[in-house]
């Protein structure tokens, strides 16, 4: 009976250590996630700006033609 209690106590102790390590990893992951939205904004800007430049490049000649009336 004593060995059973002792082994259960050891398992409980090891389990609490594992849980505390998992919580530390979670908090580190949460800190990394806080940084990710900024990176996502940069990715969105990288995707948005080339599309905007492409649209402007297509529309600019016709706009200049209409303004200067030299078509």
UniProtKB/Swiss-Prot annotation:
Tissue-by-tissue expression: Expressed by the skin glands.
Gene Ontology BP annotations: defense response to Gram-negative bacterium; defense response to Gram-positive bacterium; hemolysis in another organism
Annotated source species: Pelophylax fukienensis (Fukien gold-striped pond frog)
UniProt cross-references to InterPro entries, sorted A to Z: Antimicrobial_frog_1, Frog_antimicrobial_propeptide
Lineage: Eukaryota, Metazoa, Chordata, Craniata, Vertebrata
Physiological role: Antimicrobial peptide.
Family that this chain belongs to: Belongs to the frog skin active peptide (FSAP) family. Brevinin subfamily.
Protein name per the record: Brevinin-1P
Subcellular localization(s) per the UniProt record: Secreted
């Amino acid at each position: 009976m004593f060995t059973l209690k002792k082994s259960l106590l050891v398992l409980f102790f090891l389990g609490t250590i594992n849980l505390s390590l998992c919580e530390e990893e979670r908090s580190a992951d949460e800190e990394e996630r806080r940084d990710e939205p900024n990176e996502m904004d940069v990715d969105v800007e990288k995707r948005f700006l080339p599309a905007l430049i492409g649209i402007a490049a297509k529309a600019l000649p016709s706009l200049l033609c209409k303004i200067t009336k030299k078509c």
